[in-house]
Amino acid sequence: MKVLTKAASAIGDGLVAGFVGTAAMTVSSTIEARLRHRAASTAPARATAKALGIRAFDSDLAQARFNDLSHWGYGTGWGVVRGILGAAGVPAATATAAHGAAVWGSAAVSLPALDVAPPFVFWGREEVAIDVLHHTVYAVATGAAYELIAAGRRNGGG
């Protein structure tokens, strides 16, 4: 029973941490988009829609809402991986680096596979650097949130 409790806690803590990381990434990408005068990314909605077989949206508003749900769901869900790494005893910095690499790597593979974006080797250095920056913000914020939650749990706070 203790293993199930630890696993459930890791999953729950990871989900909360993933939500925090997604919020941090949203802030960083929103600031960057405004500074560069570009529209928000629609890659989350296009990738999720393609994976689910959704061909069109009734309106731009419906697509924007679906994009937000996809973005928040994806980031929050990936927090589970960070929780599992933490529960497995992987040191915090290593877990955060592995988590960040997994998240960025999965996007780098899945978006071209779904024909949502070209492979990152065709993006140009600046675009790759910006994308890595946002994913690093996500991974570091998720890792920090997970470690704070886990420390609180160890100290009797949950």
What function would you assign to each model-found segment?
Residues 1-158:
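Short amphipathic, positively biased membrane-proximal segments
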